Amino acid sequence: MPESRLIPISVPKSRNQIAYQLGASVTDIGLPYLTLTAELNKVYPFVYRNFLPAQNYSNSNFSLGDWMGANADRIEFIANYHPRARLNVRAYYRLMKKGGLGTVEQQYYLTPTPVYGFDPQYKTSKISLETSYELYSNVNILFGYSRYQVTPNIQKSVTSNQVNIGLVFSPY
């Protein structure tokens, strides 16, 4: 942690740049072989960035932090069910919001620094339902449907629907 201050997070002049991830998973609740998972990720502005570019949390310009980058959050819900041996049914929902990256001046010289969610860029949502059946060891038949929607702040939203049918070979 190259930059840290002993100022409480609640002080408006502090530049506390944090990210956190909370999650829970419960199995066999109400129905045998059912696993429910919920996860929340929140990355405040300017996390993973430093005044000195050599100290940024990146490798070859790829962030080493969360894939959303700074000033973003997402919530995910997953239900995984195995009604029979070798049969798996999975439902998934994700909602994500992304804000702007900001500038070095905003990060270091603006007091207080911009709050989470400043300069909103877009929202995305994804819902999917997949089922797979294991024919042989590491050979699965897969069928799935997903709906993905991107809503930029200055344009109309774009929605894509996708149906997947396939034969999956896995060496592990």
Placement of each model-derived feature along the sequence:
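Exposed, low-structure sequence patches enriched in small/polar residues
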Residues: 1-172
